[in-house]
A protein has these predicted regions:
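Beta-propeller folds
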Residues: 1-186
Length: 186
């Protein structure tokens, strides 16, 4: 196959009439090599000599209700990592909120990919998202100021679908908690 294309992302500040580029070189793990490279000693040595930033794509940028903060959903093009990063809108710098790594493939219900991820804001400081950090797709929240992350669901099942109430107090979810082939609404 062909080599994947690369993408650069920018943010335009209308008030300052300035463009900021997303600086991905400080993302934790941006130079990590996938485990499969160990099976190719020559390639491993070459890549260790010249560690390069992996190519990434910013799939979404979610703004807080008041526009104070933005969370970028960033994925490595090799599909091994997903980072949720808070964007400092004054400098274009990124702060890690959550990192998911999977040597097989980052994916799963509501975690992004071709259908986009399930995520949003509970208030101006609290962002919710889905992650397969435990091996199952579950809901989490993170305070974008402190970085404190909390699981909202847990167990040996997947949250298949999620919707947040208008008042942002309740999640309506469908899960396969009783059986992998059954979905139940809560």
């Amino acid at each position: 196959g062909s080599q994947q294309g690369t993408v650069e992302s920018f943010l335009y500040d209308r008030v300052k009439d300035t463009i900021y580029s997303f600086k991905t070189d400080s993302i934790p793990g941006i130079r990590d090599l996938p485990d499969y490279v160990k099976d190719y000693p020559k390639q491993l040595e070459e890549r260790k000599k010249k560690p390069a930033n992996r190519a990434v794509s910013i799939s979404t940028l979610n703004w807080s209700p008041k526009g104070t903060y933005a969370v970028a959903d960033i994925r490595s093009n090799d599909n091994k990592d997903r980072w949720l990063m808070r964007l400092d809108t004054a400098t274009g710098k990124l702060m890690l909120l959550d990192r998911q790594r999977d040597e097989a493939w980052i994916g799963g219900p509501g975690t992004g990919g071709f259908g986009g991820g399930s995520a949003g804001w509970l208030d101006d400081n609290t962002f919710w998202f889905r992650s397969e950090a435990t091996g199952y797709s579950h809901l989490y929240s993170v305070n974008v100021i402190t970085g404190e992350k909390k699981p909202l669901t847990s167990g040996t099942y997947e949250v298949q679908q999620v919707s947040l109430s208008k008042d942002k107090k309740y999640f309506y979810i469908s899960t396969n908690e009783l059986h992998p082939g059954e979905q139940h609404f809560y």
